[in-house]
Amino acid sequence: MTEYSETGMIGSGAITTKRLSKEDINALPLAYWQGPVHLIATAEEAAAVAQRCSREQLLGFDTETRPAFHKGQKFIPSLLQLATETEVFLVQVQASGMVGPLRDLLANPAITKAGVAPSFDLHSLQELAPFTPGGFVDLSTMARQ
């Protein structure tokens, strides 16, 4: 059985980039978020979240949007997810709006925001309120390298 740690595979002492088999994946322990999750529904709360997150060096980033099933149909994001090392914020952007402090946070190049294929999410958020994204890292691109 292969042994794992938070930093990668342990064995010969070096981290390997080999593909994991289904058996290896199924042998991994299940993990889930155990920290606080905050639901944000007002502009004031969204501004406070932006202020809180602006003290971080790294944020997790994602959005959730209603799926479209017809050609040409599209919807705006309903949820902006921001995660620090210790807490998660679920911002209901249709209720709170893309307040200035949130736009400033998403534009700040000094704070790394990591997500999977964030360009689509960012384009959708920019339809709610214009801003120039800064500091975003696409984890799917990094995973392919």
Describe the predicted segments one by one:
Residues 1-59, 124, 128, 139:
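N-terminal accessory regions of nucleic-acid-interacting proteins
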Residues 63, 93, 116, 139:
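Residues immediately flanking
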Residues 53, 58-71:
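Short acidic, Gly/Ser-rich segments with clustered Asp/Glu that frequently serve as metal-coordination loops
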Residues 69-87, 94:
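A short alpha/beta connector and helix-capping loop motif
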Residues 48-49, 97-109:
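Short, basic/hydrophobic alpha-helical segments
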Residues 60, 112-118:
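Acidic beta-strand-to-loop metal/phosphate-binding motif
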Residues 81-85, 110, 119-145:
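Metal-dependent phosphoesterase core characteristic of DEDDh/y 3'-5' exonuclease domains
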Residues 35, 87, 108-113:
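Short active-site oxyanion
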